[in-house]
Amino acid sequence: MTNRRQLLTATAGLAAAAMLGSPAAHAQADLATPGPLGDVWLGPADAKVSIIEYASLTCGHCATFHKDTWPALKAKYIDTGKVRFTLREFPLDPLATAGFMLARCNGNDKYVAMTDLLFAQQKVWAFTDKPVDALSTMVKQAGFTQDSFEACLKRQDIYDAVTVVKDRGAKAGVDSTPTFFINGQKRSGALSMAEFDKILEPLLAG
């Protein structure tokens, strides 16, 4: 009996070790690890459901989600304490990287308001002949001066931090934007409110 019990224990240990070394386990570890600047969560830490969004500030589908779905999602699930949500950086181009750097430069308490502004006004700054000039004009609404705008975009620490988040996202399986991880399960694309309802209601009821 003792030998059988020892064998079962050893087998379970080997299985656990194999799981820890598997690509799926590494992906979950990358997903669970916040970037150097930390995650900015909305909603209570003990919420039953967590949503991590990976997005690019120059992604049209991401802007569509934040314009059409995000307000209703926030009101129904996050403001009511049922779900917590964070937006992580997955810039698809240097302009999106610059936008995320600017969202981080004034501290995490300004991050959500800044990313909301940049998504809402995406067509004004991201798709123009002079996008950097348009971005500079846009962020002055959030308190930047030309000097602080230029200083922010020269900060290697912020650039490196945004890059770390993107690289970890890629290791976790992000290959397009927006990508959502809902309690660790991957969903790609600008999900509608109806699609979120279909996913979230069973998780909240379980």
Question: What are the residue ranges of the model-derived segments?
Answer:
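Short amphipathic alpha-helical surface patches that mediate protein-protein
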Residues: 12, 119-120, 154
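C-terminal cap of thioredoxin/glutaredoxin-like
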Residues: 2, 6, 28, 56, ...
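Short, flexible micro-motifs
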Residues: 46, 102, 192
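Structural alpha/beta surface segment adjacent to cysteine/selenocysteine redox centers
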Residues: 55-58, 63-140
